[in-house]
């Protein structure tokens, strides 16, 4: 089976809420493919939340969409795990004077109403019968001729899913078939569960872009130029910097609509840490994306120079359908004809200090500042020391050598193996 494929009957194992989320993710990807924000898609995320008959609501601020899985810019999806014969359709949307207000409103707005039935896998005549049942149910509405109706069965849903590799990664993971290491957009920097993970853009980290003539930008100044570079270039983009400067978190922010403006399309993001030997390999994944002509942004964390060089040449030759972002601690011999290099480095303790206060609120401002300054702004070193600070302890009187030794302590006991 191809990497981005799945047997349609496997979808039957999705729960109600997973089905709803799948449709929402597909709608987000479809909207983004048309050049609009995924934020145009709203869904409750809970089958128990009152929704008034709406599971997923798409509202794109334009008059018309190009033909595809979304036909009208205002579309309501109703997700159903069970089969939907004529009788079930009539119960769902009502008839005559009992017609659902949601349907009437969609008709008034010249919108679309689509039932997605996971339990159905219809023959052409079966789908025709269900569409007729939907049309008959709304025939008495004064605006019924303006309403677009459709019925998506399991085959239609799998056809839609095959168009969006990142959503395919998500659904395979939900079904326990996930590829080892590969992830859609998410918390790639792997913060502790339950911890606030908004981007810290305080002074203390600088970013140098290839076209910036060596100018060092603060994080909030660099986000939009980084996005513009990734959109415009047909070269691979290499993010370099020492371990602990926040490379992965900054790349994650490029897809975050709450950071800056005009975020990269998170619905096409495919991430992996190559240090964990992913299956399929990064080379196989890229080859598959290029062969199928899929739009994707591949992010390869901890990507060695040799692998980067191999993939960068393929991406550069193929055009802009697949964008490649790699992350690593140094540059080595990257070829400028196939690579744009963005360098990140620490420039003070501010970001590391704020991160410590966020992760260890009981550590106190003074301790956080002392650790961040000692770590020279390196977040990874600072976090490692902070983990070893006792409740109520003050670090003010500790020498640098004593702080350094904290890196080699396990539960208050020195660990010689770590030092070695």
Q: Language-model segments: what does each one mean?
A:
Residues 18-112, 120-127, 161-163:
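Catalytic centers of nucleases
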Residues 58-65, 74-76, 90-101, 240-268, ...:
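P-loop NTPase Walker A phosphate-binding motif
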Residues 87-106, 120, 167-224, 231-234, ...:
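Winged-helix-like regulatory helical subdomains adjacent to P-loop NTPase cores
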Residues 340-355:
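Conserved AAA+ ATPase "SRH/arginine-finger" region at the nucleotide-binding site
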Residues 131-186:
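Charged, structured surface patches that assemble and position nucleic-acid processing machinery
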Residues 46, 79-80, 240-243, 268-278, ...:
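A short hydrophobic beta-strand->loop->alpha-helix junction that borders the nucleotide-binding pocket
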Residues 244, 250-251, 332, 337-340, ...:
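Amphipathic alpha-helical "lid/sensor" segments that cap RecA-like P-loop NTPase cores
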Residues 121-124, 304-311, 315-343:
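Sensor-1/coupling segment of RecA-like P-loop NTPase cores
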């Amino acid at each position: 089976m191809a990497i981005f494929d799945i047997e349609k009957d496997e979808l039957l194992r999705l729960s109600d809420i997973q089905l709803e989320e799948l449709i929402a993710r597909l709608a987000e990807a479809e909207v983004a493919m048309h050049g609009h924000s995924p934020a145009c898609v709203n869904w409750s995320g809970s089958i128990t939340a009152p929704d008034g008959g709406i599971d997923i609501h798409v509202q794109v601020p334009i008059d018309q969409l190009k033909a595809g899985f979304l036909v009208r810019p205002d579309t309501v999806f109703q997700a159903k795990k069970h089969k939907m014969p004529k009788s079930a359709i009539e119960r769902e949307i009502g008839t005559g004077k009992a017609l659902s207000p949601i349907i009437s409103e969609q008709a008034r707005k010249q919108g679309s109403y689509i039932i997605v039935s996971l339990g159905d896998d219809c023959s052409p005549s079966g789908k025709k019968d269900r569409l007729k049942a939907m049309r008959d149910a709304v025939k008495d509405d004064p605006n019924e001729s303006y309403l677009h109706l459709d019925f998506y069965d399991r085959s239609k849903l799998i056809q839609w899913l095959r168009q969006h590799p990142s959503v395919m990664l998500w659904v395979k993971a939900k079904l326990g078939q996930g590829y080892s290491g590969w992830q859609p957009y998410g918390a790639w920097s792997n913060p502790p569960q339950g911890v606030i993970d908004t981007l810290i853009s305080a002074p203390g980290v600088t970013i140098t872009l290839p076209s910036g003539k060596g100018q060092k930008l603060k994080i909030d100044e660099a986000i939009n130029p980084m996005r513009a570079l990734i959109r415009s270039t047909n070269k691979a983009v290499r993010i370099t910097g020492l371990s602990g400067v926040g490379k992965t978190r900054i790349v994650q922010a490029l897809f975050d609509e709450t950071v800056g403006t005009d975020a990269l399309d998170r619905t096409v993001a495919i991430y992996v840490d190559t240090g964990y030997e992913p299956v399929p390999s990064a080379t196989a994944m890229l080859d598959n994306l290029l062969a199928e002509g899929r739009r994707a942004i591949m992010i390869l964390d901890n990507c060695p120079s040799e692998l980067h060089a191999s993939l960068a040449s393929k991406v550069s030759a193929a055009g802009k359908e697949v964008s490649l972002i790699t992350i690593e601690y140094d540059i080595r011999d990257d070829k400028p004809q196939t690579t744009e290099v963005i360098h990140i480095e620490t420039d003070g303790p501010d970001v590391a200090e704020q991160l410590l206060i966020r992760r260890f609120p009981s550590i106190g401002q003074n301790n956080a500042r002392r650790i961040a300054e000692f770590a020279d702004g390196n977040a990874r070193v600072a976090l490692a020391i902070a983990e070893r600070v006792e409740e109520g302890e003050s670090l003010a009187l500790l020498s640098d050598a004593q702080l350094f030794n904290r890196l080699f302590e396990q539960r208050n006991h020195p660990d010689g193996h770590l030092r070695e």
